[in-house]
Amino acid sequence: MASYDKAWYVGTKSEESGDMQGEIVVKTWKANPSWDKNGDGVIQYVLIKGEPGHPDAEARTTHVTKYITENGIKVQKLNANWDTARAKDIVDAWIQKHGDKIEFIFSNNDSMALGALQSVQSLGYNQGDNSKFIPIVGVDAIPDMLNEIKKGTIVGTVLQDSLNQAKAVVDLSLNVANGKEPLEGTQWTLDDVKAVRVPYVPITLDNIQVAEDTYK
């Protein structure tokens, strides 16, 4: 980017989505002590990973558990990471193997999280009985995921704030087109690689309207 005089980047920090996912886990875990099924104070979790080697998948996988442990909660992984579009089939196998030992499902994206939900529901979980509930968290804040959060079947997701990303692109473009400095009169800042980083937003039922507003 530095080699181009008139080029800037608007986007996010991949690791932040994992941190925000971890924030949701910490907040909801502390608010729901019954989720600690064996009472050991440790989150026994499974994780559905995206494409191996992809920066977003790697960052989300690393940072979700890093954030949780840095906030005083121990974790124990019950599975190897999986790259799969067949999330339901994989979670079916995990449920059969681990059953009620699974206390949380972390997913690198919402599509796989919804596949996990299909799996647990087919086995009697997440259907309104609080004693048979496995919390699930994803990333992307797609409409189907938001609907499940409102139903109470999914705990949360992470919004990539496309609305504010678009605003940043427009603001910088208009300034440059009018011969101004790219940031003049805007709320944005540039990092050391000429990038505007728009923060991710953790989404739960408490602030779901924030995500829904991006689709209006």
Predicted regions and their residues:
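Loop/turn elements at helix/coil->beta-strand transitions in domains of secreted/extracellular proteins
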Residues: 4-6, 42-44, 69-75, 99-103, ...
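Solvent-exposed loop/turn segments at secondary-structure junctions
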Residues: 1-3, 15-16, 51-55, 81-85, ...
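Hinge/cleft segment of the Venus flytrap/periplasmic-binding protein
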Residues: 41-52, 56, 67-68, 166-216
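Short, solvent-exposed amphipathic alpha-helices that sit
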Residues: 17-24, 55-73, 90, 115-119
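Extracellular/periplasmic ligand-binding modules, especially the Venus flytrap/periplasmic-binding
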Residues: 108-117, 150, 160-178
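Short, hydrophobic alpha-helical segments
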Residues: 25-33, 95, 170-181
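Hydrophobic alpha-helical
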Residues: 64, 76-148
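Flexible loop/hinge segments that line or gate small-molecule binding clefts
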Residues: 1-23, 27, 32-44, 142-150, ...
